[in-house]
UniProtKB/Swiss-Prot annotation:
The keyword ATP-binding does not apply. GO terms for cellular component: chloroplast thylakoid membrane; proton-transporting ATP synthase complex. This is ATP synthase epsilon chain, chloroplastic. Pfam families: ATP-synt_DE, ATP-synt_DE_N. The lineage of its organism: Eukaryota, Viridiplantae, Chlorophyta, core chlorophytes, Trebouxiophyceae. SUPFAM superfamilies: Epsilon subunit of F1F0-ATP synthase N-terminal domain (SSF51344). It comes from Chlorella vulgaris (Green alga). InterPro entries: ATP_synth_F1_dsu/esu, ATP_synth_F1_dsu/esu_N, ATP_synth_F1_esu_C, ATPsynth_dsu/esu_N.
Length: 134
């Protein structure tokens, strides 16, 4: 038995396929979902979700949203989603280093919050390309 995973963004269905397992970046940490998981709704943080199908792990950068798990269906609504194939490795690494530097140099609460948001997005994109080994 498998999970039916659907990742939707405001402008398209990003992923709609079967999976054996999915690991979600929730606001309280990573959460794994296997078949026959208890029903739940959870908020998703900016981060990497890992989708396992046929012994292959597919990393996807998610930019915050919600997930609904019910009857072996995982429906994910996110602001944005990216796969390693659409992210440039060099661009992702440069953006990550720049975001890290800006976060370290941020002063004041507003600047720190904005820098943290940019850092999380850049880190998720960088982790996706590094995980796939592109």
């Amino acid at each position: 038995m498998t999970l039916q995973v659907c990742i939707m963004t405001p402008d398209r269905i990003f992923w709609n396929d079967q999976a054996d397992e999915i690991i979600l970046p929730t606001n309280t940490g990573q959460m794994g979902v296997l078949t026959n998981h208890a029903p739940l709704i959870t908020a998703l943080d900016i981060g990497v979700t890992l989708i396992r199908s046929n012994s292959n792990w597919n990393p996807v950068a998610l930019m915050g949203g919600f997930a609904l798990v019910k009857q072996n269906q995982v429906t994910i609504l996110v602001n944005e989603a990216e796969s390693a194939q659409t992210i440039g490795v060099d661009e992702a690494e440069i953006a990550f280093q720049e975001a890290k530097t800006k976060l370290e140099q941020s002063q004041g609460e507003k600047q720190r919050v904005e820098a943290t948001f940019v850092f999380k997005r850049a880190r998720a994109r960088y982790q996706v390309v590094k995980q796939l080994g592109v």
